[in-house]
Amino acid sequence: MKLISWNVNGLRACVKKGFEDFFKETDADIFCVQETKLQEGQIDFAPEGYECYWNYAEKKGYSGTAVFTKKHPLKVWNGIGMEEHDQEGRVITLEFEDFFFVTVYTPNSQSELKRLDYRMKWEDDFREYLQELDKEKPVIMPGDLNVAHEEIDLKNPKTNKKNAGFTQEERDKFTELLGAGFVDSFRYLNPELAGAYTWWSYRFKAREKDAGWRIDYFVVSERWKEKIEDAIIYKTVMGSDHCPIGLQMK
């Protein structure tokens, strides 16, 4: 089973930069995107052979997620069932016969960590949501988690310790998530591989210099880790400030 996840930083913009070519080339069983920045009816993208599911933020031009799946889900729903978290189009859950597929766009803590307190609440509530699902059947959770977990996961750890995405608080929450029975599929297969980044700032020629961060993940229920066959970072694929990532499951 081939799965792809990509923070497209605006799907309409990304479609103009080769999104559909990559979509067709990869021919994934399930392809999910984050940060669509869309409202309903603003794009005509309905790939043949796929069912399409969208979750839009209430605020225009902000956040949003989508899933395109060849596999027919038993059930699909948006959000995590908590009003304070469900207005920004951040989560779509698809239930299949033997697993849950949950795509997420985790809230950014923002400059000066304005949203860090909210982020901490989100982390706890979202983790509990995943744990409840995991009691029923294994979970595959791809998305932009807006955290580089360890120093190996970004080019310049020392200068970023107080910046959104690498605060100790955010890193500890990711550790807590893994401790709740989940694995970071990429690190499971590549425990010591440095220079594996998925996001680069548009400033300072960061992508050219490969001064990146790994903040996009496929998190998988621990009991399914043996099924992880390959975890891919499509580093050379342009179109967004993130690159796509892939997961091959047995």
Predicted regions and their residues:
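Surface-exposed cleft-lining segments at the edges of enzyme active sites
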Residues: 81-82, 107-123, 158-162
